[in-house]
A protein has these predicted regions:
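Surface-exposed amphipathic alpha-helices with a cationic face
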Residues: 15-22, 120
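C-terminal subdomain of the subtilisin-like protease fold in secreted/lumenal serine endopeptidases
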Residues: 1, 24-26, 52-55, 67, ...
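Charged helix-capping and loop-helix junction motifs
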Residues: 11-16, 41
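Short acidic, glycine-rich surface-loop motifs adjacent to enzyme active sites
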Residues: 1-13, 25, 31-32
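Active-site environment of divalent metal-dependent phosphoester hydrolases
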Residues: 35-40
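Soluble non-cytosolic domains of exported or imported proteins
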Residues: 8, 12, 102, 106-110, ...
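Extracellular S/T/G-rich loop segment that most often corresponds to the catalytic His/Ser-adjacent loop
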Residues: 26, 45-121, 152-155
Length: 156
């Protein structure tokens, strides 16, 4: 999901949707947000700050934290769970241009969602079990867990 705002309090509606999705063996993956401004860094915004929704941070091709990627906060649920490529990502745009390069946690999120689909297809995992597989198989990074969660998403 590529929605975002700078509201640090979690939303009851988003949390209920995340819980219902997990109960029905579905996983919602959302961008952590692009409004990091030290000090202290701005934290994960809605809907990714809901405990039942997986929050995705962005890293570059050198596995450095993207300077815009929000980090974990002290509010319940406002934590980064995993990271994906989110800097200089080649993506489609309307004609006539066809393609362009973008940065953002909204570029990292489809990487995580795509890998989740591969894990689900290969193992049959769904919902919370899929969440656990993604985070337990992520590549640890030499960055704070508060910024990248369990690390870089990995394929099967």
């Amino acid at each position: 999901m590529s929605l975002g705002n700078q509201i640090t309090n979690s939303s009851t509606a988003y949390e209920m949707a995340g819980q219902r999705a997990l109960q029905n063996r579905c996983l919602i993956v959302a961008a952590a947000g692009n409004h990091r401004q030290p000090p202290p860094p701005d934290t994960v915004g809605q809907p990714a700050n809901s405990p039942s929704i997986m929050a995705v941070a962005a890293v570059d091709n050198q596995l450095r934290l993207a300077p815009f990627s929000c980090g974990s906060g002290s509010v319940a649920g406002s934590k980064v769970d995993i990271a994906g490529p989110g800097v200089a990502v080649y993506s489609s745009v309307p004609m006539p241009a066809r393609y362009a390069v973008f940065n953002g946690t909204s570029m990292a999120t489809p990487h995580v969602a795509g890998v989740a689909a591969l894990w689900s297809q290969a193992t049959g995992a769904k919902g919370f079990q899929l969440w656990h597989q993604l985070t337990s198989h992520a590549r640890p990074l030499s960055l704070p867990v508060s910024d990248v969660g369990s690390g870089l998403v990995q394929t099967v």
